[in-house]
Regions:
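Short, well-ordered beta-strand elements
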Residues: 32-46, 63-68, 158-162, 278
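Short helix-initiation/N-cap motifs at beta->coil->alpha
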Residues: 42-45, 63-78, 186-197
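A conserved helix-loop-strand patch within extracytoplasmic ligand-binding domains
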Residues: 107-161
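Pocket-flanking alpha-helical
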Residues: 51, 68-107, 197, 217-222
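An extracytoplasmic/periplasmic, membrane-proximal ligand-sensing/linker region
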Residues: 34-37, 46, 168-184, 188-205, ...
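Ligand-binding pocket segment of bilobal, Venus flytrap-like solute-binding proteins
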Residues: 84-88, 160-238
Length: 322
């Protein structure tokens, strides 16, 4: 009888301790506010993955999360007012000016790097080098022979450059004018359309010159090179007297660098735990490239790829929300 009582007491104590432990865990998971944290979605696969990853991790911590479709550059108006809260990918290559202007107001905060490094530039398949001798040096594009090699019925005698969607920015129209390139900029309607055209041209060995970025699967799948423009400096974009054209800015290539997280400055006060998790979020180019490949080439959904990553990396993301 005495032994059984002790046994029951031990079981009771263990269960009580477990319940208390669970209760403490749930208490820690309670969000500082039940208002939804609004993360912005854009129009390329990698950003959809990054944002859904962050959303799922925040949900694990008990936060209410809402995903909101928003224009890549115009979103800063919503981030400044607090109508939108976090943008998970602001690329140094295309968004630096808008980000700097927003953070200068004090209403938007740079929440640190994502861990990924951005590269965006004009890109061509290597089979085009024979038709445009001198590549990858950008000077080759100034010749009539190269313009003709990259021309289409709609742009001839000018060459055709396929840029990203207009909402991405990037200053390609300005670059063509500043460098006096005999090319016409045609903007793809979507990220998917951009790379569908690359796939079609590559299979036919047809002429194509387009915007390619990394992290992405395209530079790994296709054999090609980025055009080497004059190296970017801040002065190139801000001071017309800099560079080969003394009268115009943007006479250089795109900047390379970080992919940043940005958000409404009020996030750290309203949701301090979520703020810390967003700051801690980090993923590298190889991981992201592999996930983009799963979606774009293997036909998996963003949600499935994100769920797989969450399942395999609990030790990692749990550190972000502890």
């Amino acid at each position: 009888m005495h032994i059984r009582t002790i046994s029951r007491l031990g079981r009771f104590t263990a269960l009580t301790a477990a319940a208390l432990s669970l209760g403490l865990g749930l208490a820690q998971a309670q969000p500082e506010s039940n208002d939804p944290i609004k993360l912005t979605l854009h129009d390329w696969t990698g950003q959809l993955i990054t944002t859904n990853l962050m959303a799922e991790v925040l949900k694990k911590a008990g936060y209410n999360v809402e995903l909101v479709q928003a224009d890549y550059l115009a979103q800063f108006a919503g981030l400044e007012t607090g109508d939108l809260h976090v943008a998970m990918e602001m690329w140094e290559t295309t968004g630096r000016e808008a980000m700097d202007a927003a953070t200068a107001t004090g209403k938007v905060e740079n929440m640190g790097p994502t861990g990924m490094k951005a590269k965006e530039e004009w890109w061509y398949p290597t089979y085009m080098k024979e038709k445009c001798p001198g590549l990858p040096n950008w000077d080759a594009l100034k010749t009539d022979a190269c313009a003709e090699a990259f021309s289409t019925a709609e742009t001839a005698p000018k060459g055709r450059y396929l840029g990203g969607p207009v909402t991405w920015g990037g200053f390609d129209d300005e670059r063509v004018e500043a460098l006096d390139l005999p090319f016409e900029v045609i903007h793809a309607g979507t990220d998917a359309a951009l790379f569908a055209e690359l796939e079609s041209a590559y299979q036919r060995q047809a002429p194509i010159l387009l915007w390619v970025y990394a992290p992405h699967w395209a530079p790994a799948k296709y054999e090609g090179e980025w055009v080497e423009f004059p190296e970017y400096t801040a002065e190139c974009y801000g001071d017309p007297s800099w560079g080969s054209n003394p009268d115009m800015a943007y006479d250089c290539g795109k900047p390379f660098g970080e992919i940043w997280k940005v958000g409404w400055a009020g996030v750290k006060d309203k949701w301090p735990g979520a703020y810390d998790a967003i700051k801690a979020f980090s993923i590298d180019n190889d991981e992201m490239g592999a996930m983009i490949t799963e979606v774009d080439l293997d036909g998996k959904t963003v949600e499935a790829v994100v769920a797989d990553w969450i399942g395999k990396n609990e030790a990692r993301w749990s550190e972000w929300i502890k």
